[in-house]
Amino acid sequence: MKVPAPYAWNSDFATTYENIDSEHRTLFNGLFALAEFNTLTQLNAAIEVFTLHFHDEQGQMIRSNYVNTKEHTDIHNGFMDVMRGWRSPVPQQDLLAGMAWLANHIPTEDFKYKGKL
């Protein structure tokens, strides 16, 4: 999926799960704020919201016996490894890659669990 401009969640990213969609909005906002201000505080805040969201989403997958939980968790862990490697100020190319990752992850990976959680 194309990276939205301005960088914000929109209905193209709707998973049909209100709590997950709300958290996805927070992820978009976190990366947008990091791109705008690029401070250590914003970097830590972005890492925190991604960590919390991935924990919540993976918990919902486990409770629903979602068949692809491990594969999905591995994808999350890979991105968290990337984010935790970022240093403030985060280079523009890393920010753009992170923004693209999220914009692509939701429709390619998260949409696989629609109707299954």
Swiss-Prot record:
Oligomer and partners: Octamer composed of two types of chains: alpha and beta.
Protein name, as recorded: Hemerythrin subunit beta
**PANTHER family on file:** BACTERIOHEMERYTHRIN (PTHR37164:SF1)
Keywords, A to Z? Iron, Metal-binding, Oxygen transport, Transport
Sites binding Fe cation 1 sit at: 24, 53, 57, 110
GO molecular function (one): oxygen carrier activity
Q: Which Pfam families match?
A: Hemerythrin
Q: Which domain of life is it from?
A: Eukaryota
**Species this protein is from:** Lingula reevii
Q: Does the keyword Magnesium apply?
A: no
Q: Could you confirm whether the keyword Iron appears in this record? A: yes
Family the entry assigns: Belongs to the hemerythrin family.
Q: Where does Fe cation 2 bind?
A: 57, 72, 76, 105, 110
- What function is annotated for this protein? Hemerythrin is a respiratory protein in blood cells of certain marine worms. The oxygen-binding site in each chain contains two iron atoms.
